């Protein structure tokens, strides 16, 4: 019988990522875990609908036995079974993030007995979660280099608070893992600005694009009008394609916040990324930790290690025989992964 891993949900940034990473790793390694103080660092601690959906999805995919899987619970015991490929559908029932639920279960399906499709309904444009276009255009090309083949499709947008969005991913078992080296970003090839609108006047998008164009030379400027019933909602994105990596940044519009202020927030974030020679942005760094750890080697550079990143690393090291080493050099932090030997 494998040992039970005990996790403190209040460690580090104290959010839901601790539990999501633990669920992924438990399904992959077969190691059971218990976590207390779930989301202790949040204003409303405990399991919300999004987190509960992730737990139920993980339970279904591997036939786990679970204790504490209920709304508001701050304690969870998870004993995994065998991961099974298949066609899965999960509904969050709110505007909670579809991609964060997918992020929980897809790594386990890299080790399944056959191909899978996972469809999640809920929120797709959430200020605190990666949108589907980030997964599709930024993360998945890097996963392919590691040897992980999955394809995400956004079937319908769902903005806060209504939700109603749908995201689906098709994924195949991994034959073998490759190491990823992301030390340098390289020269910028082009930048693309994009605005999504649903039930919001077009002049809002035009003002947002104008704000981006005032700060950056945009190769493309795209405005996409979505059906009104998918809103109201507004998202502004800016994609930076460099020689070695593509990064994508986004901001979700808010009521009573002007188009110029919304776009200026995005400009500030992109300028912060470009001011450093680091290859990887803050949020992409979080996404790379688990797949690169499964590969057992690799490295990337980030401007500054966030508390979120450090917390995720700590959880991964509890489950996998790897060590992360962080070294500051030439104005960036180099994150290196090595496999531990017996």
Swiss-Prot record:
Localisation: Cytoplasm
Keyword Chloroplast annotated: no
Enzyme class: ligase
Annotated residues for binding of ATP: 103, 283-287
Keywords annotated in UniProt: ATP-binding, Cytoplasm, Ligase, Nucleotide-binding
Signal peptide span: none
NCBIfam families documented for this protein: PRK04204.1-2 (NF003246), PRK04204.1-3 (NF003247), RNA_3prim_cycl (TIGR03399)
Xref: HAMAP family: RTC
Function of the protein: Catalyzes the conversion of 3'-phosphate to a 2',3'-cyclic phosphodiester at the end of RNA. The mechanism of action of the enzyme occurs in 3 steps: (A) adenylation of the enzyme by ATP; (B) transfer of adenylate to an RNA-N3'P to produce RNA-N3'PP5'A; (C) and attack of the adjacent 2'-hydroxyl on the 3'-phosphorus in the diester linkage to produce the cyclic end product. The biological role of this enzyme is unknown but it is likely to function in some aspects of cellular RNA processing.
PANTHER family: RNA 3' TERMINAL PHOSPHATE CYCLASE (PTHR11096), RNA 3'-TERMINAL PHOSPHATE CYCLASE (PTHR11096:SF0)
Protein name listed in UniProt: RNA 3'-terminal phosphate cyclase
